[in-house]
């Protein structure tokens, strides 16, 4: 398929700047693959489509406050540093993106905090905007991380055009976030409240948790028309024995398995064996899913409404069928659904 097939006009006022007041009260569009029927619901109604022993697979990654603002030595010029991942705990080395990149060179010192309490030195250039920083900090690793994160803020995507607010620390995180490492939230999971998950448990629905540390590659623009030539950034993922057991049992019993989000779908499609069963996995994936694609594990998925030309939209179109998903998006625009990270949700049912 071609990149241009995923272009559509998205007015800026359709992008949600804030989450719904309550997690489970965002809107939910239900799309039935077999009939093409589209229903309009509230997210907590998702319960009506699942039964005893069905399984929801969640991504339990935890977002860390990855965006820092600081100053460059001597000039005092304001700079932004986006933390990607820790490279070496002992040496306090981090892989980061910097802005403005042209002014930040090897050997520069960067200062963070009102009293310049945190200092970092640029020790390598990795890409045009990528740098390796060494943070200069006396104290334990835990104290360092605490001090670093106190200076950072929730790394909202650039299409949410507003300053970070207090609510973002909580709402840009799922309630089941556990394993730290993501620089963006697995957005489909944001709609699940404690109350909804309790009601799901009471109904006998099982939960499986996998981990994919969602990275900035989710928002990187594709610069090739031929999608087979696009390379995804690698993301770290884990699938443990518990998740395999829960998912494989449900599959063997013909139960409905729901992938909550594109990160979960990429994780399970990476970790599936040739027999269609989920296998344990600890490593990295750069799997890019776009139409046509044969899915092996899930027979339903929850996802948000994504931006034009995004790899996220391509995965959803591969799962729901290109024509049906693009029709659903057209309907969503007409019916004033909210798009993006803090927007509304879609449930695609294949059973």
From Swiss-Prot:
Keywords assigned by UniProt, alphabetized: Cytoplasm, Queuosine biosynthesis, S-adenosyl-L-methionine, Transferase
UniProt key word Transferase: yes
The UniProt record lists the keyword Cytoplasm: yes
Catalytic reactions of this protein: 7-aminomethyl-7-carbaguanosine(34) in tRNA + S-adenosyl-L-methionine = epoxyqueuosine(34) in tRNA + adenine + L-methionine + 2 H(+)
Top-level taxon of the source organism: Bacteria
HAMAP family: QueA
Self-association state and partner proteins as the record states: Monomer.
Family under the similarity heading: Belongs to the QueA family.
Cited Gene3D superfamilies: QueA-like
Functional description taken from the UniProt entry: Transfers and isomerizes the ribose moiety from AdoMet to the 7-aminomethyl group of 7-deazaguanine (preQ1-tRNA) to give epoxyqueuosine (oQ-tRNA).
GO cellular component terms listed in the entry, alphabetical order: cytoplasm
An individual GO BP term: queuosine biosynthetic process
The protein, known as: S-adenosylmethionine:tRNA ribosyltransferase-isomerase
The protein's Enzyme Commission number: 2.4.99.17
């Amino acid at each position: 398929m071609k990149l241009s097939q995923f272009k559509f006009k998205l007015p800026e006022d359709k992008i949600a700047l804030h989450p719904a007041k309550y997690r489970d009260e965002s809107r939910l569009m239900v799309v039935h693959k077999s009939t093409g029927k589209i229903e309009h619901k509230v997210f907590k109604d998702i319960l009506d489509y699942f039964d005893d022993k069905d399984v929801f697979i969640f991504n339990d990654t935890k977002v860390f406050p990855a965006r820092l603002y600081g100053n460059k030595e001597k000039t005092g010029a304001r700079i932004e540093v986006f933390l990607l991942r820790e490279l070496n705990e002992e040496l306090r080395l981090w892989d980061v993106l910097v802005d403005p990149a042209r002014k930040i060179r090897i050997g520069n010192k960067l200062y963070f905090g009102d009293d310049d309490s945190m200092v970092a030195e640029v020790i390598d250039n990795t890409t045009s905007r990528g740098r390796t920083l060494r943070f200069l900090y006396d104290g334990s690793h835990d104290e360092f991380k605490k001090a670093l994160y106190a200076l950072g803020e929730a790394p909202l995507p650039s299409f949410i055009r507003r300053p970070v607010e207090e609510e973002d620390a909580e709402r840009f995180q799922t309630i089941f976030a556990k394993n730290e490492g993501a620089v963006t939230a697995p957005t489909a999971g944001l709609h699940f409240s404690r109350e909804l998950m309790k009601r799901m448990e009471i109904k006998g629905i099982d939960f499986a948790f996998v981990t994919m540390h969602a990275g900035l590659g989710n928002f990187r623009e594709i610069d090739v028309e031929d999608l087979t030539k696009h390379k995804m950034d690698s993301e770290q993922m884990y699938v443990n024995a518990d998740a395999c057991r829960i998912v494989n049992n449900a599959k063997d019993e013909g139960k409905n398995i729901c992938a909550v989000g594109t990160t979960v779908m990429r994780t399970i499609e990476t970790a599936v064996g040739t027999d269609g069963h989920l296998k344990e996995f600890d490593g990295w994936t750069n799997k890019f899913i776009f139409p046509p694609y044969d899915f092996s594990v899930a027979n339903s998925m929850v996802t948000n409404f994504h931006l034009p030309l995004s790899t996220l939209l391509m995965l959803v179109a591969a799962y729901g069928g290109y024509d049906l998903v693009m029709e659903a998006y057209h309907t969503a625009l007409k019916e004033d659904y909210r798009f993006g990270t803090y927007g509304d949700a879609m449930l695609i049912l294949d059973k």
